[in-house]
A protein has these predicted regions:
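Periplasmic-binding protein-like
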Residues: 69-79, 100-102, 263-269
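N-terminal basic/disordered segments at the start of proteins
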Residues: 1-33
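Cap/lid and interdomain-hinge subdomains that line or gate substrate/regulatory clefts
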Residues: 1-4, 36-38, 107-225, 230-234, ...
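Long, internal scaffold/assembly segments composed of regular secondary structure
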Residues: 224-314
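Short, acidic/small-residue loops that bind anionic groups at enzyme active sites
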Residues: 88-116, 124-129, 287-300
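C-terminal catalytic subdomain
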Residues: 293-407
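Glycine-rich, highly charged phosphate/nucleotide-binding loops
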Residues: 48-68, 82, 246-253
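Extended hydrophobic packing segments that form well-structured cores
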Residues: 24, 363-466
Length: 466
């Protein structure tokens, strides 16, 4: 659940009754969207709003008391509002969270001194003061909006996603299990740049994980539990039982590392050492983790899993790591995404466990069981790629939306036909800017909230494709 502090702005010589009714309208909308609110009781200030130095202090103290709960702050203006009281509240609270500034519509039939809001004008003053105070803020899509309207509803959902992303990345701890595959320079990244953004990388040698896994007994309680979890997660018909048991042991070892290091996501060296020296692929385990909202990326793609984690935080749904992989006939706006795969099963129409056809020819089919294969179900999706630009010392990203079409292909692995408007322009951007071929995706529409979080609040270099 997202938690917002709420500031209702009031200016003394404007009609306070608008704040009383406006406050309740806004709170009702937030409750409808299952957003928890932190706000003083209505009788604690005039109209339950903020208009004076004393009011600002009261609200700042309330917000400080709940600072570990509050994900963001909504500033709403049922009338002109007192810009100083609003800015002082935020400064003294010291929350350092996203802020959304909203203003009510005036109605042409109620423009007398008794009912005129002037929120249209007051919003400019509030934003001017926030800028003077050095407080970063977001805006609604329309300059003024009715709380009960579809625009405000969409803006609240977008802002909640922004808040969740900013919160999620603060102190995020990500596990890198194994070195990157030697042939994949494309997944290089700067650990130091991520650290400056509050994202810590915990490394673990692949041999340490395999050491734990190989010491486990088939009858170990944790292994039995994981084995049952795998068999309940996907169809394993035709897969050797020995391979599934090996997966279970590997899963126990990985989860031990996650728990000990308090991780929120992992990236794993998935080829070819695991197959050569242990005898399975980790795809099913990674699929299960991602489906359970513990994102896991293949090929030790750390910035790839950062993108997955961002998408998951924004949407509350599983995210996957995919290759932008193929054209789709001659349609310039369609293509095919693919991985071997470790996609979360919620992405698929139907899925099953299989073997990794690409590397089976090198290491033997018997050593490559454990992929999750199928066709991605039709529906909208948001994609995101995060990358560290080491030459310029910054973190950059691109984000956009598209649609999985559900069209089927005679192919292997986990795949999906997709459509993105102006796809060729996006591909030109990816190649010109030297981005990786991996992209994260989630089956939700959350690009706007992610763009706001990364560019406005984290100050990353972000391209929004539309």
């Amino acid at each position: 659940m997202t938690t917002l502090g709420v500031i209702v702005g009031n200016r003394g010589f404007f009609p306070a009754h608008l704040c009383v009714t406006g406050r309740q309208e806004v709170l009702d909308v937030l409750a409808k969207h299952h957003i928890k609110t932190i706000i003083l009781p209505a009788d604690q200030t005039n109209g339950g709003a903020v208009e004076s130095l004393a009011d600002a202090k009261k609200y700042a103290e309330l917000f400080q008391k709940h600072r570990h709960e509050i994900d963001g702050v909504l500033v709403t203006l049922p009338n002109f509002g007192d810009e100083r009281a609003i800015a002082n509240t935020l400064r003294w609270a010291g929350l350092n969270v996203p802020v959304l500034v909203h203003a009510f519509n005036d109605r042409t039939q109620t423009m007398t001194i008794k009912d005129r809001r002037d929120s249209f004008c007051g919003k400019m003053s509030a934003c001017n003061n926030l800028r003077q105070y050095g407080i970063t803020y977001s805006l609604t899509t329309l300059h003024t909006e009715e709380p009960g309207g579809k625009e405000f509803s969409a803006d609240i959902q977008r802002f909640a996603a922004t808040c969740r992303v900013v919160r999620a990345l603060k102190g995020a701890r990500i596990g890198a299990i194994g070195a990157r595959p030697g042939a994949f320079n494309t997944v290089r990244y700067s650990e130091k740049l991520l650290e400056t953004a509050g994202i810590s990388i915990e490394t673990l040698d692949l041999s340490e994980v395999l050491g734990v896994a190989t010491k486990l007994s088939d009858t170990d309680a944790a292994v039995k539990e994981k084995l049952a979890g795998i068999q309940g997660y996907t169809a394993t018909g035709g897969i050797p039982q020995l391979s599934v048991i090996k997966m279970a042991k590997l899963g126990v070892a990985i989860e031990k590392f996650i728990k000990e290091r308090e991780l929120v996501a992992t990236a794993i060296q998935c080829w070819t050492a695991l197959e050569e020296f242990y005898g399975v692929v980790p795809c099913t385990l990674m699929s299960m983790m991602s489906n359970g909202l513990m994102p896991s990326a293949c090929e030790t793609d750390i910035t790839g899993v950062v993108g997955m984690y961002i998408l998951q935080a924004a949407s509350g749904k599983p995210a996957a790591l995919l290759d932008w992989n193929n054209n789709y006939g001659t349609d310039p706006d369609k293509g095919v995404v693919f991985h071997c795969s470790n996609l979360p099963k919620d992405f698929f129409e139907s899925q099953k466990m299989d073997y990794q056809e690409i590397i089976a020819g090198t290491v033997g089919r018997e050593n490559t069981y454990g992929t999750i294969v199928g066709n991605i179900a039709a529906g909208p999706f948001t994609y995101c790629r995060v990358s560290t630009d080491d030459n310029n010392g910054l973190i950059r990203a691109y984000v956009g939306e598209g649609e999985f079409t559900g069209e089927k292909l005679d192919t292997f692995g986990g795949y999906g036909v997709f459509k993105v408007n102006r796809l060729q322009a996006l591909l030109q951007f990816i190649c010109r800017e030297g981005y990786e071929h991996h992209v994260a995706a989630t089956k939700a529409v959350v690009a706007a909230g992610i763009d706001d979080a990364l560019s406005n609040y984290l100050k990353w270099d972000v391209y929004r494709h539309e």
